[in-house]
Structure formats: structure tokens, C-alpha cells
Amino acid sequence: LLMVDYINIVERAIIDELRTKYPNASVYAQFPEAAALEFPALILELQASGVDERFIGEGMTFGGSSGKGEIYGLAYRIHIMVERNTSMDVSGTAYKQRRLLNYLMLNVANDINSITFGASDVEVVERHLRNWEDVGYASGLELWGASTSYLVYFKNYRSS
């Protein structure tokens, strides 16, 4: 029996959603090398796997099949970075600097919470987006930024 690659399915769905909604932003699945960083940057960083596991090895159903598994959690850190000269067109208006950061914080939060993970691929049962933290400006780097934590819990169906 081949195991399903649930972690990469969840991560790919988040990355694809961000790339679709923000085609003028650079979306990274990890921190890029400094020389490769392009702005505005949306960085998804997997921080923990197996967070708050529940019902380990118990019976569960997935679609029409039943077997053993658990609720498995992933913890991501999402970073937004905007540099001084970055702008993004929002309904015909150029958003820059702090205004762009504010726009991205609200809309990235809305968009990742609206992802419809394909039920045939992975059954997400719960998710939590924490508040944006470290919101601010680094004057030496001329960067605006913010970070948040995003938790995703899914059924890890292991065997029949």
C-alpha cells in the first residue's frame, strides 16, 4: 500500500493559491537566497509537522473507505515582505510600502482561509490563522514585513 503524500498536497495547495491570487508577487516555499529574493515576497515556511496529533491509530473513514489513521497537524509560518520601491496595482491604484503590506496581510489571510482542498486528495478538518506579528519597517533594509502562523489539520489515513 502506497502512502499518500498529504503534507505536499496541503503545501502545494497553499502555494498554488497564493501564486494564482498574487501573480505579481514572488511566492516561495522556503526562504530564498538573499540574491534571489524578489518583491513583494510571500514566503511559506513549514515549521512543524505532526502538531497536535489526535486519535493516533484509531478507526476513521476517508471517502468510502475505512481504516486506521489520525488527525495530523502542520504548522506554517507565512511571511510578507515589501521593499521600498515595490508596487502592486489594486483596482487601478498603485499600492506601495505600508499600504501594500496592509492590503496583503488582509487579503492573504482571506485567501488562505478560503482554500478548498480537494476532498479526494486530502480531508482538511480544521485550520487556524493566527494574528499577524512583527508588523513593521526595517529602515536599514528599507523593508516592510509581517509574519503569521497558519495551522492545518487533516485526516492522515494510513491503512485499511
Per-region residue spans from a language model:
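Short, well-ordered secondary-structure micro-motifs within conserved domains or adaptor modules
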Residues: 37-48
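Charged, amphipathic alpha-helical segments and their flanking helix caps
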Residues: 1-34, 49-160
